[in-house]
């Protein structure tokens, strides 16, 4: 069905009025949705079914957000959590069905299901064009996220933005100083204190938070290990050098997304085991390996880490 529409329409989100203007009937639209050729993102907004099915959770949110922007009756920019996918960031632990926008006219917006309109004052440099859509800058997005997401979810996003050098802690703190009148910024202080650009992944951030909440010694992210010649051999996800213990987070990406060319999952697992053995040989340290399932029970995970640290002390 999408072949009836121009490429400029079907390449992303299109509205019912776009389809009607292209000569597609109401009945044909209904049939396209029923057959899965189109997916309805929200009332009157669609995307090609194959594009939607290939999309990640973050990409699907970005499609939904574009639908909201296209249907908005006033000028808005994607902001807060809805700005994150435009920078390729993760949306962990947050509602993916709510789109956040900031109005440029600073007026109070009408309540609408699935849309949260913000009235925040946007200063020079706070809005950029990203992927063809107006969105808050990485620095402004970082600050805004801390005001609308829970601590752990916010820190996941903040660390990601910092690690990929889309902004810096210095820039974030400077921008935050100009927003002290902004509501809900008390949590921002804490997030900025906990943030660490060395932390690379969602799993590492969540593990760091477990340690902090359970009163464990703070681990050092990305600890470098050198070989016998003094060359860097590996970087450890999280480490406690004083205890000679390190932690590796075994997320699925380690064995799928980051596989080497021609390497099977089994090959990747074996390579990781050899790497662990070599690190232990070079350092004499003990390794703790955890997975997503471990993070589902933070108290139990903290007890496990604490037990290893006690033995090593």
Where are these regions (language model features)?
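Short gly/ser-rich loop at a beta-strand->alpha-helix junction or flexible surface loop bordering the NTP-binding
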Residues: 1-186, 310-313
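Surface segments flanking catalytic/ligand-binding clefts of nucleic-acid enzymes
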Residues: 7-10, 25, 162-313
């Amino acid at each position: 069905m999408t072949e009836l529409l121009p490429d400029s329409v079907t390449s992303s989100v299109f509205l019912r009025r776009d389809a009607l203007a292209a000569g597609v009937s109401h009945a044909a639209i209904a049939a396209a949705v029923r057959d899965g050729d189109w997916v309805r993102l929200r009332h009157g907004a669609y995307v090609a079914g194959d594009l939607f099915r290939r999309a990640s959770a973050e990409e699907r949110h970005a499609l939904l957000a574009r639908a909201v922007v296209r249907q908005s009756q006033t000028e808005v920019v994607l902001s807060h959590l809805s700005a994150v996918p435009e920078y390729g960031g993760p949306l962990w632990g947050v509602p993916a069905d709510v789109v956040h926008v900031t109005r440029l006219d600073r007026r109070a917006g009408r309540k609408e299901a699935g849309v949260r309109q913000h009235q925040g004052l946007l200063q020079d440099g706070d809005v950029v064009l990203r992927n063809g859509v107006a969105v808050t800058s990485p620095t402004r997005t970082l600050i805004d996220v801390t005001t609308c997401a829970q601590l752990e979810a916010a820190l996941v996003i903040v660390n990601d933005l910092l690690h990929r050098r889309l902004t810096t802690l210095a820039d974030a703190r400077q921008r935050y100083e100009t927003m002290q009148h902004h509501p809900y910024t008390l949590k921002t202080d804490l997030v900025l204190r906990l943030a660490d650009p060395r932390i690379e992944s969602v799993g590492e951030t969540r593990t760091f938070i477990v340690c902090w909440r359970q009163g464990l010694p703070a681990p050092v992210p990305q600890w470098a290990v050198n070989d016998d010649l003094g060359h860097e051999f590996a970087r450890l996800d999280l480490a406690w050098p004083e205890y000679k213990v390190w932690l590796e987070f075994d997320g699925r990406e380690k064995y799928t997304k980051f596989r080497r060319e021609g390497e099977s999952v089994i090959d990747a697992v074996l390579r990781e085991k050899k790497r662990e053995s070599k690190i232990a040989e070079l350092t004499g340290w003990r390794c703790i390996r955890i997975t997503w399932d471990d993070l589902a029970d933070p108290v139990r995970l903290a007890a496990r880490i604490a037990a290893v640290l006690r033995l090593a002390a």
